Amino acid sequence: MTDPAQNILDIRQILGLLPHRYPFLLVDRVTEYVPGEYIKGYKNVTMNEPFFEGHFPGVPVMPGVLIMEALAQAGGILVVKSTDTPVEDKLFLFTGIESVRFRKPVYPGDKLELHCRLLRHKLKLWKMEGFAYVDGKLAAEAVMTAAVTNREDM
C-alpha cells in the first residue's frame, strides 16, 4: 500500500474531479487520502469569499451550511478516488445529513481542515462522517449521506 501522505491533490487535479467552480469550489487541496477509507484536505478561507459581504457585515463568519458543503466536496473526492467510475458522467448529491454540530466559528484567514471517513457504501449510497477543524480545534462535524447518479438522469 502506498503512503497516504503521498496521495496529494492540487487544485488542478481537484478541478478534474469535482464539477464545482468558483465561487462554489470549497476544497483547495487534498493532503492525503486512502481510497475506500478517508480523506484530508483544506479550504483557505479569505476575506474575498463572496458570502462574507452579507454574512455578517462587520463580523464576517463562514456560514455553517458552506462548512458542510466543503466537507461534502471532500467526501465527493473520496468517492471518486474510491471507484472506477468516470467522473464526467456522474453527479454526487446530498441525500442526508445527520448529527450536525457547529462548535467554533470560522473567520477570514482561517485554514479550514476537512477530514472525512467512509462509514459504509451500498450500491449508489455513500455514508461518511466529516470533521472540520481550525487550528486543531473542532469547528463542525456531521454524518453525511450522498448518492451517485448519472448526469443524464437529472
From Swiss-Prot:
Among SUPFAM superfamilies, the record links this protein to: Thioesterase/thiol ester dehydrase-isomerase (SSF54637)
Gene3D superfamilies documented for this protein: Hotdog Thioesterase
Q: What is its EC number?
A: 4.2.1.59
**Which catalytic residues are annotated?**
55
Protein name, as recorded: 3-hydroxyacyl-[acyl-carrier-protein] dehydratase FabZ
Q: What class of enzyme is it?
A: lyase
Instruction: Provide the function of this protein.
Output: Involved in unsaturated fatty acids biosynthesis. Catalyzes the dehydration of short chain beta-hydroxyacyl-ACPs and long chain saturated and unsaturated beta-hydroxyacyl-ACPs.
Q: Which GO terms describe its molecular function?
A: (3R)-hydroxyacyl-[acyl-carrier-protein] dehydratase activity
Task: Output one GO BP term.
Answer: fatty acid biosynthetic process
State a single Pfam family of this protein.
FabA
Does the entry feature the keyword rRNA-binding, yes or no? no
Query: What InterPro entries does UniProt report for this protein, alphabetically?
Result: FabA_FabZ, FabZ, HotDog_dom_sf
Give the chief site where it resides.
cytoplasm
Q: Which keywords appear in this protein's UniProt record, sorted alphabetically?
A: Cytoplasm, Lipid A biosynthesis, Lipid biosynthesis, Lipid metabolism, Lyase
Family of this protein: Belongs to the thioester dehydratase family. FabZ subfamily.
Which cellular component, as a GO term, is one annotated location? membrane
Q: Which reaction does it catalyse?
A: a (3R)-hydroxyacyl-[ACP] = a (2E)-enoyl-[ACP] + H2O
The organism sits in which domain of life?
Answer: Bacteria
Q: Where would you find this protein in the cell?
A: Cytoplasm
